[in-house]
Amino acid sequence: MIYPVIWQNNCVLLIDQTRLPNEYAVVEIHRSEDMARAIQTMIVRGAPAIGVAAAYGMYLGAREIETGERQEFLQELEKVAQLLRATRPTAVNLFWAISRMQKTAYKTLGTVAQIKENLLQTAQAINAEDLQTCQAIGDNGLAILPKTPEKLTLLTHCNAGALATAGYGTALGVVRSAWREGRLERLFADETRPRLQGAKLTTWECVQEGIPVTLITDNMAAHCMKQGLIHAVVVGADRIAANGDAANKIGTYSLAIVAKAHNVPFFVAAPVSTIDFELADGSQIPIEERNPVEIYQVGDTTLTPPGVKFYNPAFDVTPAELITAIITENGAFAPHVLTKSSQQAVV
C-alpha cells in the first residue's frame, strides 16, 4: 500500500508528488512553515491527504511554541492555523482538520506539554481514521457499481487515490475494491490538464499494484463513452455543498455532462468530512486559481506567443443533478439527501 503522509522519528515524511512518476522521493517535514509550503506547492495534494498533513502541521507548529502559559500558547497556535488555512482554499478537509486540532487544544485542561501531546495523538488519529474511511468508501462504492455480465471498465479524473489520502484512496479506493473482487477489467484515466495528475499519479499507482490502466487525454472521454468503453465514472471531491454540488479538479464538470449525455453513471467518492453543510450550494465554494505557468509552460518550454492572457482555476463545481450518487464511508447517498436537516443521518 502507498502511504503519502507518515509520522516517523518525530517528523512527517511526505512522498514528493511533484517528482512522480520519474522519481520516488521522500521529503522530511520538521516545521509548520515547511508543511505549509509542501501543501501550497502540491508536494502533498488531494483533499484528505491535505487534511492529514495539516493536522501534523498544527502539531509541528505547536511543538515550536516555547511559552508554557496556556492562553499565550493558544494565541500562537492560532497563527499556525492561519498559516495553514491560507495554503489551499478549496479543500474543506484542510479546514476541518485544523478545526479539530484547535478543538483538541482548547479542550485539554492540563499543561501546555499535555496539549502538545494530545495534538500529536489527534493528528495520528486523523491519519488512521482516514485510512479506514477510504477502505469503507471503496467497499461501499463497489456495492453500487453497475451489475454487468462482463467485468467493468471505469473512468476517473485527476488522482483520488492513495496519494490523495492517508492510503487506499476514495475514487481509486472504489477501483481497488473492484479489482480485489475480480470485477474490474480496466481503468481509464484522464490525463487531467494542466498538472497531469492522472497521467503522472493515477497511472503510477495502478502500475505499482498491477491494475490495468489506459491513459486518455481529457477530451477523449466523450468518444470513449460513445464507443461503449466506459461502464461508470468515479471521481473524488475537494468540497461538497449541502445540496450535493461537488467541487473537484477542473474538468470534472465537463466529464459529468458527457456522462449524463451517454447515460453513464457518475459517482463522487469522498469522506463525510468533505461535505460542507455550511454551504447551501456549489456557488459558495471558493475556487482556487493557480499560477498560469502551469498552462503555458512544460518544463523549460513556453507553449504560447507573447501577449496571451491566461485563466487557471484549479477546480470546477459539478451540479448535484449530474451526480448519480455520493459514496461515503457511511454508504452511498443521492445528492439531494445531503441537506442540513439530514446531516445526522449522513454523519
UniProtKB/Swiss-Prot annotation:
Swiss-Prot/TrEMBL site (Transition state stabilizer) positions: C158
Location of the active site: D238 (proton donor)
Lineage: Bacteria, Bacillati, Cyanobacteriota, Cyanophyceae, Nostocales
Pathway connected to this protein: Amino-acid biosynthesis; L-methionine biosynthesis via salvage pathway; L-methionine from S-methyl-5-thio-alpha-D-ribose 1-phosphate: step 1/6
Name of the protein in its database record: Methylthioribose-1-phosphate isomerase
Keywords attached to this entry: Amino-acid biosynthesis, Isomerase, Methionine biosynthesis
Coiled-coil blocks: none
GO molecular function, one term: S-methyl-5-thioribose-1-phosphate isomerase activity
Top class in the EC scheme: isomerase
Entry-linked HAMAP family: Salvage_MtnA
Family named by the database record: Belongs to the eIF-2B alpha/beta/delta subunits family. MtnA subfamily.
Enzyme Commission (EC) number: 5.3.1.23
